[in-house]
Amino acid sequence: MLTAIIDYSSGNLYSAQKAFEKITASNNLGSVVVTSDPKIISSADRLVLPGDGAFPSCKAELMSSEAYEAMVYGAVEKSRPFLGICVGMQLMATKSYEYQETEGLDWIDGEVKKIDPKD
């Protein structure tokens, strides 16, 4: 089984890769690859979308990457297991208000809002 960590130029790839390699090796769960190759992403058994930075810039990077359509195909059309990490998780929401209002993938009904430090 293959776990594909999606590289769209906006993620904590190294730490995610090392963590998944350790988990898959110790549990005999297949292999892990960091990739932006649509063919590999669309055929992977599991998908991971990391993210590091601001929601608007991560969304723009993802939408302009070759990986986007393959990710949607694998996660939505093929219903493969999908994990978002950090901003990768936030991108699944309906929208975000970080810096500016930005539409998300709308896979999860919800909005990402800044937490007031006073709370």
Task: Specify the residue positions occupied by each region the protein language model found.
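N-terminal beta1-alpha1 cap of cysteine-dependent amidohydrolase-like domains
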Residues: M1-P81, V87, Q100, D106-K118
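Glycine-rich nucleophile elbow surrounding the catalytic serine of serine-hydrolase chemistry
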Residues: C86, Q90-M92
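Short, conserved catalytic or interaction motifs in soluble domains
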Residues: T94-Y97
